[in-house]
Amino acid sequence: MGIKGLSQVIADNAPSAIKVNEMKAFFGRTVAIDASMCLYQFLIAVRQDGSQLQSEDGETTSHLMGMLNRTVRMFENGVKPVYVFDGKPPDMKGGELEKRSERRAEAEKALTEAKEKGDVKEAEKFERRLVKVTKQQNDEAKRLLGLMGIPVVEAPCEAEAQCAHLVKAGKVFGTVTEDMDALTFGSTVLLRHFLAPVAKKIPIKEFNLSLALEEMKLSVEEFIDLCILLGCDYCGTIRGVGPKKAVELIRQHKNIETILENIDQNKYPPPEDWPYKRARELFLNPEVTKPEEVELTWKEADVEGVIQFLCGEKNFNEERIRNALAKLKTSRKSGTQGRIDSFFGNSTKVTCVTAATKRKAEEAEKAKKGAKKGGPPKKRAK
């Protein structure tokens, strides 16, 4: 889940903290990728005929093709990836995992009903909700990345927390994930939609934690308490407190303890035995491998090893895989040259816009269209 509604809270209260960009804007950067999240995205992506990519034995292989293609695309854009895999979930996540199991049971029931009705679209929707990355798929992804020469980090606990600490230590530029709690763990930069399919033309959203804290006038500790109030994976939240109220309460009272002392708990009841202090501590001091102990080395791909795995074992088309590996080799060489060119000032200038700037431009365009139609643009209701 991450942090419920955090992206919108930042958009509303700290719009300059969000930039909209293309992948080429991150040329020369190294990024830490939440591997479980990207594997999930590859698995829920279906082909035009509505099916997943499979081997002759009927095994799903979408995760492997997705991993290969996205990795090659990153190198083609001068981006060096590091994949970080989840370890064991923290004990505090038990409640969230139970809720997910309940939602899976509900989705299974809804899927059966949709199939009985012959509702294909509804059936596809619930099938996606039932997708879960298996240990075998994780292991296969690690094997492929190893053969491709891409560094893999196995986090002792949450991948987002490990990514965040690699960012804070300066080992990588930002965290690639859809889960906003990477910011709560302290990642100074979070990149959403980084691995979205090219065909969908979804721009990358870059969230800057320092700018968000500065514009919202919050300390790191206050921001963490705000995230707990919004809703996280580790504990419940105060009933009746939505995003606007949460921001208001944190700005006024600075921390959850003082909020609890001052709010009407009959109107805004907190959870019984609310473990918000443990959640706060988990965000401040998560279980991670120390960044200085993490070695990041990119090696030449074992071409024949990849061919044996993907084509010999998983029935991929050999010509297609060799073409992808040739692109990988070429882009890694050109990427090195590109970084040298960039150092001497010959790099291509890439423009980026903040989400706020983009929104203002869209509003101005709407206003122009309204004027052309013969009347002043309508004011938005406050």
Curated annotation (Swiss-Prot):
A GO-annotated cellular component: nucleus
Post-translational modification: Phosphorylated. Phosphorylation upon DNA damage induces relocalization to the nuclear plasma.
Region (I-domain): 122-253
EC number: 3.1.-.-
Annotated Mg(2+) 1 binding sites: 34, 86, 158, 160
Entry keywords, A to Z: DNA damage, DNA repair, DNA replication, Endonuclease, Exonuclease, Hydrolase, Magnesium, Metal-binding, Mitochondrion, Nuclease, Nucleus, Phosphoprotein
Region (Disordered): 358-382
GO biological processes: apoptotic DNA fragmentation; base-excision repair; DNA repair; DNA replication; DNA replication, removal of RNA primer
Annotated spans, Interaction with PCNA: 336-344
Matching Gene3D superfamilies: 5' to 3' exonuclease, C-terminal subdomain, 5'-nuclease
Residue sites binding DNA per the record: 47, 70, 158, 231, 233
Record keyword Hydrolase present: yes
Entry GO MF terms: 5'-3' exonuclease activity; 5'-flap endonuclease activity; DNA binding; flap endonuclease activity; magnesium ion binding; manganese ion binding; RNA-DNA hybrid ribonuclease activity
Cofactor: Mg(2+)
Ranges of compositional bias, category Basic residues: 369-382
Cofactor comment text: Binds 2 magnesium ions per subunit. They probably participate in the reaction catalyzed by the enzyme. May bind an additional third magnesium ion after substrate binding.
Residues covered by region (N-domain): 1-104
Biased composition (Basic and acidic residues): 359-368
Xref: SUPFAM superfamilies: 5' to 3' exonuclease, C-terminal subdomain, PIN domain-like
Compartment(s) of residence: Nucleus, Nucleolus; Nucleus, Nucleoplasm; Mitochondrion
Chain's role: Structure-specific nuclease with 5'-flap endonuclease and 5'-3' exonuclease activities involved in DNA replication and repair. During DNA replication, cleaves the 5'-overhanging flap structure that is generated by displacement synthesis when DNA polymerase encounters the 5'-end of a downstream Okazaki fragment. It enters the flap from the 5'-end and then tracks to cleave the flap base, leaving a nick for ligation. Also involved in the long patch base excision repair (LP-BER) pathway, by cleaving within the apurinic/apyrimidinic (AP) site-terminated flap.
Assembly and interaction partners: Interacts with PCNA. Three molecules of crn-1 bind to one PCNA trimer with each molecule binding to one PCNA monomer. PCNA stimulates the nuclease activity without altering cleavage specificity. Interacts with cps-6.
HAMAP family: Fen
PANTHER family linked: FLAP ENDONUCLEASE 1, FLAP ENDONUCLEASE FAMILY MEMBER
Family: Belongs to the XPG/RAD2 endonuclease family. FEN1 subfamily.
Protein name: Flap endonuclease 1
